Amino acid sequence: MIPARPLSGHSSLLPLALALSALLLAPAAHAEKADRDKPINIESNRLEYNDATKVSTFIGSVVLTKGTIRITGDRMVLTQVGRNAQTARVNGTQASFRQKRDGMEQYIHGVADQIFYDTRTDQVTLTGRARLQRQNCNQPVDEITGGHIVYSASTETFSVDGQQRGERPG
């Protein structure tokens, strides 16, 4: 279930948030096995929902959590793409992604201008000034940078493109 909790002072969103939470379920496999069956929770300052298109737009201090997964940004567009799947496009001044690695005290941490999360493929795509780190006790162990990074949470693999998609080499 995806409860969308309004921040204090925004209780008028509660009925809409409750209706939205009944619609959005997301079972998916993740690097951290404990994340698989966790619900998605989203917090933001404002929520706009279109029932016809199944698109929710969260605006202001957006935080998506699912188990150990945490994605933050200024704005997120969440689209229902099937019965049990969603995509989330997060924008912001360096949107961020973090997930605990399975069976160890390490995290994968990424930042980019835009982050795209797809529950169907269990992939996170970072675009624009993208950086991905493997961290141990919040200290970087490895780091990669590029215009476009695709990270597969289920296989813990990634691919990097030095330029953003559509950008031509100089």
Show which residues each predicted segment covers:
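Mature-chain termini and adjacent capping regions
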Residues: M1-G170
